Amino acid sequence: MKLFILTIILLAFCSTIKAQTCDEIMEHVKSLGDGTTYTSCDGDVISKVTFYGEMINCYEYHFALVCFKQENPYDCSEYVYLVESSTETVYSTNYIANAGQAFLDFIKPHSNNLGCAPNFD
């Protein structure tokens, strides 16, 4: 039931912003402002995660932009996730101990919501 409701919300979101690609969705999310960023300097996989929120037609949408580290320390591969409202809270309380595990536990389960996440399988 939760997935069904999230799918309906996602459809409303996509029709409202008329974004067709993951890059367009990401650019729209970035245009929402600064967001709240959690940086992981010591992690092997996650460089930073930035959370954004937006209200559309009386529904609040929550996004996480995740930067995965690359060989060049100044670069990262960025992906957008549509997450639940509680995701930022649980991620922020767990990322200092292990950002990679916090990502796996709290953000990765939302990988299929937008279809913009990398495939880790």
Region locations from a protein language model:
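Cleaved targeting-peptide boundary
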Residues: Q20-M26
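C-terminal partner/receptor-binding element of secreted or periplasmic proteins
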Residues: Y91-D121
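Short acidic, Gly/Pro-enriched loop/turn segments at secondary-structure junctions
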Residues: G53-L65
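Sec-dependent N-terminal signal peptides
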Residues: L3-F13
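Sec/Tat signal peptide C-region and signal peptidase I cleavage site
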Residues: S15-A19
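A short macromolecule-binding patch
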Residues: P73-E84
